[in-house]
Amino acid sequence: VTATDETTPTIADVDRLVAWMDAEGLGTGAPLEHGYISGGSQNEIYELRRGDLHCAMRIPPPTAPAERDAGIVREWRIIEALTGTDVPHTEAIAVCTDPAVLGRTFYLMGFVDGWSPMGMERGIWPAPFDTDLEARQGLAYQLVEGIALLSKVDWKAKGLEDLGRPDGFHERQVDRWTAFFERIKGRELPGFDEASAWLRAHKPLDYIPGIMHGDYQFANVMFKDGAPARLAAIVDWEMGTVGDPKLDLGWVVHTWPEDTSGGEGSVGGYVDMTGMPSRAEVLEHYSKQSGRQVDDIDYYCVLAKWKLAIVLEQGYQRAGADPKLQGFGPVVLDLMAAAGELAESSDYKG
């Protein structure tokens, strides 16, 4: 058993977990080694080793709302659906919906051998991507290739017809998120009205429903060690659904710096974007890999900025003394202003 301190979350009942694993034929009879990896208010992740089995367990903490159990099942259905596809993903091993085992629904997925951009110290890429800018470019191309491959998965054949409501997806976006914003509203957000009106008046050129991640970015993928850059897995499917996969592309590029040659403009949030491909090159790569046009990317970028601003505003409105959530305040204002500005300046006519 991995040593933990009093503040580190622990598995509710290891004996019951072992008994369940025995019943599932997962490392039967061997001792279980387990350790906490990471977590938050919605999910905890533990590393498990038992015999030849090496996996990760994803489970809501005891304090998470009851609906997270259904969310865990949704995540499980998506990673299970990716089995046999060319989308880099974690192996789907087993799911448990019986609260008698650990009190919450959980699933086991293959342990990913690689690294996460979220684990980088001070936003510095691991070797060789810290100094080899040509190799670093591959990280960006692999990032968008992941969602290009995801967009081509036959979600109906994979049994995901009831996962989302793809019909009318774009028609619902503005109404749904405007209503959400009205419920949490604590201040005016300049740019909101302009972006909302523009989104109501425009649509994508060709909406083709598919599996979408919902929060696609460097923070939610893992790469294999060493060069060349190779995507190991897309992770954290909390927002996954069947909708418009091209919104994932908008999520990636709406903050992509125009200039990646270096300096302040090349810092894309938590990672150093110096030496990365240009926004146009990233879009071209997605288009080539997915077979989709990207002429309507302004629509997706306005929607991404507008929607992300509303999501983060909820965190800011309930921040209290939490410095991380307080920090969302100015970020939200910048995002919504940028959404309004892009809506007013874009020449997209769709």
Residue ranges and their predicted role:
Residues 33-194, 201-211, 226-229:
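ATP-binding pocket architecture of kinase catalytic cores
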Residues 248-259, 263:
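C-lobe/activation-segment region of protein kinase-like
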Residues 211-213, 218:
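Catalytic-loop of the protein kinase fold
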Residues 235-240:
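Activation of the activation-loop gatekeeper triad in protein kinase-fold domains
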Residues 164-165, 292-304:
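All-alpha amphipathic helical-bundle segments outside canonical DNA-binding/catalytic cores
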Residues 2-27:
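Juxta-kinase regulatory segment immediately upstream of eukaryotic protein kinase catalytic domains
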Residues 2-8, 183, 266-277, 281-293, ...:
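ATP/Mg2+ or Mg2+-diphosphate-binding catalytic cores
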